[in-house]
Amino acid sequence: KRNPDKRVIFINYSAVDPALTNDKCNFWHFRFDANADIKMDAITDVIAGVPSIKKMYLIGQDYSFGKAVAAAAEKYLAQKTSIEIVGNELHPIGKVKDFTPYARKILASGADGVITGNWGADMVNLGKSLSESGYKGPVYCYYCASNGITATFGEAGKGMLHLVGEGLQNPSRP
């Protein structure tokens, strides 16, 4: 909009807020990755096939993407399952260093599973707190396959982390 005679395509490799291809769509925006709704549709297909999950805890970063993940989780869990959402919490993005209080809430809620869109340091710190708290249930996530995150979970992450994503499918080490 600043230079209408010098158009540039915006090649978006990671922002998956559905608004970018819906109500805030722009002809010059191109996204490689599936949006948060499409990814949650896939995640909840998997969750619907796990009869032991009766209660789910949603936790995410407090910005448009985190809110989109929570809204999609609520929508698709309600459509496909009878799973009760026992927590739906947003935290300040990049500001929480110790997720122990959140991990304690997750444990106290009796959640059988966790859904998060967290990425980066927030996912590493959430994973660390979940592991240290003794949480053993599945974590369904969008961005939990980078080496720092898988290293944080270590061996405990095998069978615990469930990812929907694009690109490289396996991190270089557990």
Each model region followed by its residue ranges:
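Extracellular/periplasmic periplasmic-binding protein-like sensory domains
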Residues: 26, 130-174
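Extracellular/periplasmic Venus flytrap/periplasmic-binding protein
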Residues: 17-19, 27-134, 169-173
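Ligand-binding clamshell of periplasmic/extracellular solute-binding protein-like
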Residues: 1, 13-20, 116-124, 141-150, ...
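Short glycine-biased active-site loop of nucleotidyltransferases that positions the nucleotide triphosphate
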Residues: 21-22, 103, 151-153
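Structural signal for hydrophobic
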Residues: 10, 32, 56, 160-163
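Short clusters of hydrophobic/aromatic residues that line enzyme substrate/ligand-binding pockets
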Residues: 20-21, 160
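General beta-strand structural signal in soluble alpha/beta enzymes
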Residues: 10-13, 72, 87, 141, ...
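Extracytoplasmic "Venus flytrap"/periplasmic binding protein-like
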Residues: 1-12, 22-24, 109, 128-137
